[in-house]
């Protein structure tokens, strides 16, 4: 906590309730991340520019994990994404496309990442839209969840009235975030660690020995998917932590 004094740390007591409280007390924009997300490029525009994107366009989300470079749906099978056939390039900054035409059914995103607007992997939303999705307090209780993946899944399972939802997704020209699934935490059944896997125990030991991931030494030169294993590199830091 001392290392990042500008962050507002919240001790988890009840993941479901904590998430709801943070959403409702937050600013006009909401973004979710999980622990294996890496922001590997700087966001070069200000909050005002992003807010104008939402205010002036029928935009559901700004995806930090998508871009013209993210053409692979599954790096383990090398399945390719279904890329939108039409779209806009706005202010030489944002790609915009119709996510509904990418979907065979809005509750079952069969066509992949470009038809999947509600993600906890670095998607930015207007807060009032997220509040609409989770519903009132009674609705929110009904979609009980204990993890980020469960939160995402329950929102999709709840079903939406597409006619009242924003029809567009957006991203920057190239992705800024990649999910590097090097191991699994919790009950997720997603594949991970097939190329550069590192166990939780190994990571913890590195931390205790005074090492941090060195993003400057990691290779982000060929990001082709939202989920892509990146080999970890470490650097020794001055203020060594120990048990």
Question: Which stretches of residues belong to each language-model region?
Answer:
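Conserved donor-nucleotide/metal-binding helix-loop-beta segment in metal-dependent transferases, i.e.
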Residues: 42-72
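Conserved nucleotide-sugar donor-binding
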Residues: 115-135
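Short, flexible, basic/aromatic active-site loop/helix in glycosyltransferases
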Residues: 81-113
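Active-site nucleotide-sugar/metal-binding loop of Leloir-type enzymes
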Residues: 19-30
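Short beta-strand-to-loop acidic/aromatic patch adjacent to the donor-nucleotide binding site
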Residues: 28-38
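Acidic donor-binding segment of Leloir-type glycosyltransferases
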Residues: 1-11
């Amino acid at each position: 906590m001392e290392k990042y004094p500008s962050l507002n740390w919240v001790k988890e007591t009840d993941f479901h309730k904590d998430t709801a409280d943070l959403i409702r007390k937050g600013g006009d924009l909401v973004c979710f991340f999980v622990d294996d997300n890496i922001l590997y490029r700087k966001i070069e525009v200000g909050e005002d520019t992003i807010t104008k994107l939402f205010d002036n366009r029928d935009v559901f989300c700004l995806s930090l994990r998508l871009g013209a470079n993210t053409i692979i749906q599954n790096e383990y099978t090398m399945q390719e994404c279904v890329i939108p056939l039409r779209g806009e390039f706005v202010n030489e900054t944002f790609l915009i496309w119709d996510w509904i035409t990418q979907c065979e059914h809005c509750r079952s995103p069969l066509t992949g990442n470009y038809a999947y607007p509600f993600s906890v992997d670095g998607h930015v939303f207007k807060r009032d839209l997220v509040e609409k999705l989770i519903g009132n307090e009674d609705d929110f209780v009904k979609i009980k969840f204990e993890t980020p993946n469960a939160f995402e899944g329950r929102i999709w399972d709840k079903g939406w009235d597409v006619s009242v939802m924003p029809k567009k997704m957006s991203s920057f020209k190239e992705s800024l975030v990649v999910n590097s699934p090097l191991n699994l935490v919790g009950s997720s059944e997603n594949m991970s660690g097939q190329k550069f896997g590192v166990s939780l125990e190994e990571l913890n030991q590195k931390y205790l020995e005074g090492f941090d991931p060195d993003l400057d030494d990691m290779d982000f030169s060929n990001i082709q998917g939202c989920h892509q294993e990146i080999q970890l590199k470490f650097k020794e830091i001055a203020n060594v932590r120990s048990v």
